[in-house]
Amino acid sequence: MPEVSPAREPISRTYRFVMAVLAPVIRWWGRLEVVGAEHLPTAGPTLLVGNHDSYWDPVAIGMAGRERRQIRALAKSTLWKFPGLAPILDAMGQVPIERGKGDAQALQAAIDTLRGGGCIGVFPEGTISRGKLLRARSGTGRLALEVPEAQLVSVTVTGTVDIVRFPKRPRIRVEFFAPADGPVGDGEEPKAVSVRLMAEIRERAPIALPGRRRTAERLRRAAEDADPRALN
């Protein structure tokens, strides 16, 4: 019998609405370019792994993949504290996570989503880089090991740091691709999975400084003081 493909996951109205509202910023002002969209499956469990240099990265990734599927990102829990934002994030299927605390509840929610055939988006560095070399955290590897049937897809985002640099228009580029070393190997440790995925992603998308000129310069000095290699 021929193999039956998984049913395409419906995209929620709220998700479509938010993407439509933000489209002018990303598609028009940001001149969005999408490469390798075919690597993002339209159905089935998918773990999407990317770099994080700007608050706009999740939006750009969602915009780049919106014709294919709904991406549920692990997002910092403090976003749920903004008035009116929590119900929108919930309706979009986003998953709140306590940063830096090994949030078992959030990871379990992500695992359940993957096992249910959804797409989870993660940033192994855990937060915006702000010009610094951040270590990849083990959570990404844990998700990959807990749901080995999930397809592993990498994504790079560039240009989002320039969105606020008016009147200069940014050129946002989102590229989806399959990791060069393939899926999780036998006996591979969670941290090792996260590290190798992030290393390849950063080769394609080096750390970029967010903010306007003064902010970017302040972040540059702080990054160089912390680690001179960060922006070299």
Please identify what each model-predicted range represents.
Residues 23-29, 50, 96-100, 130-132:
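Short, flexible loop segments at the rims of nucleotide/cofactor-binding pockets, characterized by
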Residues 2-39, 67, 83-92:
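A transmembrane-helix-recognition feature enriched in membrane-embedded lipid enzymes
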Residues 38-41, 111-112:
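Short amphipathic alpha-helix with an adjacent loop that forms part of the alpha/beta core around
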Residues 41-101:
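Catalytic core of membrane glycerolipid acyltransferases/transacylases, capturing the structured
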Residues 38, 77, 98, 156, ...:
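Residues at the C-termini of beta-strands that transition into short coil/loop
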Residues 22, 61-62, 86, 110, ...:
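Short amphipathic alpha-helical segments and helix-helix/interface helices
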Residues 34, 73, 94-96, 152, ...:
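Conserved beta-strand scaffold positions in the cores of enzyme catalytic domains, especially
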Residues 2-14, 104-232:
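Non-catalytic C-terminal accessory region of glycerolipid acyltransferases
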